Amino acid sequence: MPELDRKSARVFSGKVVRKDLVRKVKVGANVPVFVLEYLLGKYCATDDAAAIEAGLRVVNTTISSNFARPDEANKAQSMVKDKGKHTLIDKVKVRYLADDDKHWAELVNFGHKYVHIPEHFLREYDRLLMGGIWAQVDIRHQYDEEAKGKRSPFWIDGLKPIQVATFDLEEFRESRRQFSSEEWLDLLLRTIGLEPKNFDRRLKLLFLVRMIPLCEQNYNLVEMGPRGTGKSYAYQELSPYTILLTGPTTVPNLFYNMATGKMGLVGIWDAVAFDEVADLQKMQKEVVTTLKTYCESGTFARGKDALTGRASVAMFGNTNQPVDVMVRSSHLFMPMPEVIREDMAFLDRLHFYIPGWEIPKMRVEYFTDHYGFVVDYLAEALRDLRKHNFTEAIDRHFSLGSHLNARDVKAVRKTVSGLIKLIYPHGEMSRDELAEIVELAVEGRRRVKEQLKKLGSFEYHQTSFSYIDNETREERFVGVPEQGGRDMISSDPLAPGSAYTASVDDQGKVGLYRLEVGCSPGTGKLKIAGGIEGTMKESIQRAFAYLAA
């Protein structure tokens, strides 16, 4: 067994699982990933090939006989009645009804909302009352004709959570100290099913940026890139606390329904992700307007009330052109629907733009066969970390440059905070490790501002983003690779006939130009094309006269 697998299994005993086995079972079973991982951890926690094969057979048998499918609810209820008792894998929710002065359990796929549950389970697993948990349930059929109040024939005799029912953040942080940052990065990547040896350090960090909305409150993320790069995976499979929307939504659904008095998605979920963002073209303008206010402050107004939410927002879209074409001919928000891309104030509230074109399309060889966290355990860790704040961590060693305004600083700080929660949850990192994530955070925010500069001209002209070492006072400027980064003007000698020049207008704005002179057969006469007037036209005529002499 490789060293990292051995260490992971030792330090996080019972909380890691072999990811290749998850894929093998997932293909043939439409059940939540954390249910599969629980069963695999129970029956396949070994290196013995024969034992693993036997364990896989048990897992498949357990799923086929115990997993309750929603379309077979009546069949499952009838089977429990006929057999007298049965073991099911289902999601269990518990609510208190004052009229009955009693707690009732609901088995979601079993299709019954009134199941008797012993009170001691509520004391052991308080999450039963807060959204519910997936569990292995021993259910019994016994009809009591003498019972008072609401009658139900179904009773829970045993309940064993499949999800993490309790989580200790301090234990998680202490365990993190036993890994180097490189080992921890690799373990996180294997948790989402990827083999880290296929990716360089930068790509590993970009994969983790996708997960920042899961651990950072009110974080606004956008990613545009080719299809098939796994943009929305974390919001479908990694956490039960996120929701992925695949089409237009409404203000009542997303924020607050005044008719029913119920909170919308941003008040229920930790992160709300929009997949295929181009499909939002038909979304009402009011949604974007309200979302714009929410993305700035986490608040929104409905009727007379000002309400708050903590959900982060992630937007994913597909590009139909190579990035170099978009950079030259338009801007990187072009794949977004018109209702969003024309609202510069909304775009300015995005904290990070992931360059999805750098991430390769997923291939079979990119998937890992090694140990990673049980996804539900990591989901609990990320959810617990949302309560903590690392936005001031950057001040230990660095300060931000003068071109970053208040929104830019907020965006960079939140990105740094999110990456620290993911990579350094114990809060310990070197100066160089902090510099690495600060530089990435600055780059992601600058990518947003560079597009706004194209859309809004000089209103967003200050994009020379930098950060300063507080000890040496060295200022490091951060570029965006798709526009040439800091090497857009090469240090190599220019070809003959080419030159760079700069000019300052009457408002003090600086413009940088590249002049290229070509040579082709002509008539010997000067013809000035375009709308050139005044001083520039006279300069050209004077230069031509000089050459003609």
What residue ranges belong to the model's regions?
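Helical mechanochemical/support elements of P-loop NTPase systems and associated helical scaffolds
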Residues: 180, 184, 283, 287, ...
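Conserved, well-folded catalytic cores of nucleic-acid-processing
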Residues: 191-195, 280, 294-298, 319, ...
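Conserved P-loop NTPase/AAA+ ATPase motor core
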Residues: 480-549
